Design a protein with these regions (language model features):
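PLP-dependent amino-acid enzyme catalytic core
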Residues: 1-333
Length: 335
């Protein structure tokens, strides 16, 4: 384990090439619930986020928790500024990057992260380089180009786009790829804080999460553990469930085979663009959380995704992308 105390310069990997996690000195301390009620964004939880003076925000977070049945809720992240939960992570990552003097940022994306990064970097005055797969629908490229003139296309998957980025990257570009810096997880963890608050400071029994790179699952689990350690909630921790498609399911395969880490998923192909992550950097971290929480990893038949997504959207009026079909399919199984 390595410890880094200097947050005044950009933080990426550890020296051994592994993701870093933000830790706070809260052990043994019972804190009163500290939420800024005046904030209707994720920054209402500023007391449990890294200390910064100048926040880069577009109004992300504090999204609806919609009840579908007496014991079933869905978190509607489509109402975030650029239409996805990626805005949570980007608000934190870009805020910290700006505070640390970063002038240019780069990342590969399957779609939504690139759109979000470009928007937040424009707000911060940071140049943003986004690498997308050539197969991405044109509307994602256009939405990214709305806020960044530096958009590149390469390969069929986010892994291919990442390889192209490595070839083109120059030394002063700060890489905010999934888990290559620690603060996107801090933004995503606010999902967990919001869910607990919206349930009246209680935990759900189970959280089903559509899992590509996994920062949302990692972030929510981090939030639940923090909340319990501070004494804000005394319920048992939730079971975490990773939902994937049969078109790309490295986490499910590794979980079923009791592996410590994921293997690269060859020839990945799914209409759920955010799940087309054949080699998740945080694979071992995700698997640890699933086992610690007594959770599971399950995949839904790729051929059913379109129909499941349509059914979900008709029921909720959320207009979810196809990742929503994966979660809806698992919710029908009664995990």
């Amino acid at each position: 384990r390595q410890i880094y105390n200097n947050t005044k310069k950009p933080i990426t990997f550890s020296d051994i090439g592994k993701p870093l996690e933000v830790r706070y000195n809260w052990e043994g301390v019972k804190k009163d619930i500290d939420v800024d009620e005046s904030q209707k964004t994720l920054w209402r939880y500023r007391s449990v986020l890294p200390k910064v003076n100048n926040i880069i925000s577009l109004g992300e977070g504090y999204t609806p928790l919609q009840q579908l049945a007496p014991d079933l809720y869905v978190k509607n992240e489509t109402v975030n500024p650029t239409g996805s939960f990626k805005d949570r992570g980007m608000s934190l990552a870009v805020t910290l990057a700006k505070a640390q003097g970063v002038e240019e940022i780069c990342l590969p994306s399957a779609g939504n992260a690139g759109i979000s990064a470009a928007a937040y970097c424009k707000e911060a005055g940071i140049k943003c380089h986004v690498f997308l797969p050539e197969t991405i629908p044109s509307e994602y490229k256009k939405a990214t180009e709305k806020n960044s003139k530096n958009v590149y296309l390469s390969g069929k998957t986010i892994s291919d786009a990442g390889k192209a980025m490595i070839k083109k990257k120059v030394n002063d570009w700060f890489d905010i790829s999934t888990l290559k810096e620690p603060f996107r997880v801090e933004g995503k963890k606010t999902l967990g804080y919001e869910i607990a608050e919206q349930l009246g400071w209680r935990f759900p029994d189970v959280v089903v999460y559509e899992t590509g790179g996994g920062t949302g699952l990692i972030g929510m689990w981090k939030a639940f553990v923090e909340i319990k350690s501070m004494g804000w909630v005394n319920d048992p921790l939730p079971r975490m469930v990773a939902a994937q498609s049969t078109g790309c399911a490295p986490v499910v395969k590794a979980f079923q085979e009791r592996q410590r880490d994921t293997d690269f998923w060859e020839n990945s192909d799914t209409v759920a663009l955010g799940l087309n992550v054949p080699g998740p950097l945080g694979g071992a971290w995700i698997l640890d959380i699933l086992r610690e929480s007594k959770g599971i990893a399950i995949m839904i038949d790729e051929q059913r995704l379109k129909a499941l997504t349509e059914e979900f959207n008709n029921l909720t009026s959320i207009n979810s992308s196809d990742e929503g079909g994966v979660v809806w399919g698992l919710s029908l199984i009664h995990i």
